């Protein structure tokens, strides 16, 4: 068991009966918890050679930025569509009830670049899968995905077969488990 797990607050029956909400804000509010989360996520990168960390809006920023800083690597934000001011590349993807788009500054990701994608959560894998495709469209290679939490019962990892995927804390639950 990761030491980070003690800082995650589990709230039963929220937002509705049968769901266990995994609240990571309790990790962020505690200096020791935050340090552990960033350190353990960084350890998951191991000896992987890479050029930049790509963080997904918004909680991927919370962990990706300090990881990039500690490793002296670039940080590249992937945002919801319409949030970046320079020329972007974007990709649409399906959600459970609709669709969404994410984008990145086109010039920030260059052909041949090797990146690690960081987010807070592997759930269904849809956003992470879209981010992998977005990076690959620009000629870069995703060499690893690192997240704080994984909800194994939602099988998101099954969509992320093109590169190694790591999570610090995994919950076995199927539906009825969520995280924010």
Which residue stretches match the model-derived regions?
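Conserved acidic residues
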Residues: 51, 113, 143
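Active-site-facing substrate-recognition patch
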Residues: 1-52
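Conserved G/P- and acidic residue-centered "switch" motifs that form tight phosphate/ATP-binding loops
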Residues: 120, 125
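Short Gly/Thr/Asp-enriched flexible loops that form oxyanion-binding sites at enzyme active sites
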Residues: 62-71, 130-132
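PRPP-dependent phosphoribosyltransferase catalytic core
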Residues: 6, 129-180
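Residue-level signature of catalytic and energy-coupling elements of molecular machines
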Residues: 18, 53, 75, 145
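Short, glycine/charge-rich flexible loops or terminal/linker lids adjacent to PRPP-binding catalytic cores
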Residues: 74-116, 176-177
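Charged, well-structured alpha/beta interaction segments
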Residues: 50-66
């Amino acid at each position: 068991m990761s030491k980070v797990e003690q800082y995650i607050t589990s709230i039963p029956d929220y937002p509705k009966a049968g769901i266990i909400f995994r609240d990571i804000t309790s990790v962020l509010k505690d200096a020791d918890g935050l340090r552990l989360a960033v350190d353990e996520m960084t350890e998951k990168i191991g000896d992987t050679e890479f050029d930049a960390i790509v963080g997904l809006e918004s909680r991927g920023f919370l962990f990706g930025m300090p990881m990039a800083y500690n490793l002296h690597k670039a940080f590249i934000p992937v945002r919801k569509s319409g949030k970046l001011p320079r020329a972007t590349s974007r990709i649409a993807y399906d959600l459970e009830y609709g669709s969404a788009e994410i984008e990145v500054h086109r010039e920030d990701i260059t052909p041949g670049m090797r990146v690690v994608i960081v987010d807070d959560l592997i759930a269904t894998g849809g956003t992470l899968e879209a981010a992998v495709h977005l990076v690959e469209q620009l000629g870069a290679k995703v060499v690893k995905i690192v997240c704080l939490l994984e909800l194994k019962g939602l099988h998101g990892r099954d969509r992320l077969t093109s590169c190694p995927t790591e999570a610090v804390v995994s919950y076995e639950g199927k539906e009825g488990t969520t995280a924010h």
